[in-house]
A protein has these predicted regions:
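Charge-rich, well-structured scaffold segments of protease-associated domains
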Residues: 1-146, 152-183, 189-199, 205-236
Length: 236
């Protein structure tokens, strides 16, 4: 436990590690262009791969427009276009602000000695901090008064013009009530469980697109739920 607490609240990240893990300029490793410089970094390369698919770009575009200027509107792993803008000092400031015990909830589970566990947290973490006045919370995104339309461009996989991805989403209420979440997943099951389900069938047989979007679902994992239906392979 002490190792996890130390790694979370007191990570040992020096600037050289940041350059390796985050982003840096490096030489191309091949015989043809030894003098060519490229942008590298473990996290940078990971996020380039994660955001290379059409679905991941569409999902990010959807969240940006459903949750404008909101926590959920930002790529949690880092947008590859923005990662090179991050500085070492800004990362330290972010950690200092957000990874503070005042912004933490400690959960315990199982048949364990709770007082002993709390004492270990006190010794390893809490006694090293003072209460923070920062109020960090995930606020509710504002409801839409009218439909919102958004367009996001991506590099197509081919020159096929029937390669558009169209999504329709409804931003709903909070998902704090487990009964509401269960009912939402039940509705999703009725609509999308298999090819005979009404919405799945409608999306599969329509000539408006080639296949249903794999983002067609009821999302109950954020503070506010939202329902999405869509098609891939839509013509221009």
């Amino acid at each position: 436990l002490s190792v996890y607490l130390d790694a979370t609240f007191f990570p040992n990240l020096n600037e050289l590690d940041f350059m390796q893990e985050g982003h840096r300029f490096d030489f191309v490793e091949n015989d043809k262009s030894k003098d060519q410089i490229v942008l590298k970094g473990i996290v940078y390369n990971e996020m380039k791969g994660a955001m290379s698919s059409i679905s991941s770009q569409a999902d990010q575009g959807l969240n940006e427009n459903l949750f404008t200027n909101h926590t959920y509107g930002y790529n949690s792993g880092g947008d590859p276009q923005d990662i090179p803008k991050l500085t070492y000092q800004n990362l330290l400031k972010f950690h200092e602000k957000h990874y503070h015990p005042s912004n933490a909830i400690f959960f315990t589970y199982g048949k364990i000695d709770i007082p002993a566990l709390q004492n270990e947290i006190q010794i390893n973490v809490l006694k090293h901090f003072s209460p923070s006045a920062e109020k960090i919370e995930v606020k509710e995104s504002k409801s839409f008064r009218k439909p919102k339309y958004a367009l996001k461009n991506y590099k197509p996989l081919s020159n096929d013009e029937n390669n558009h991805h169209v999504l329709v989403s409804w931003l709903l209420g909070t998902s704090l009530d487990p009964v509401d979440k269960m009912e939402a997943k039940l509705i999703e099951s009725v609509l999308l469980e298999n090819s005979a389900s009404p919405l799945s069938k409608a999306l599969e047989v329509t000539n408006l697109g080639s296949v249903p979007s794999d983002m067609t679902s009821f999302d109950t994992y954020k503070k506010q739920m939202y329902f999405t239906a869509g098609l891939e392979g839509v013509s221009a």
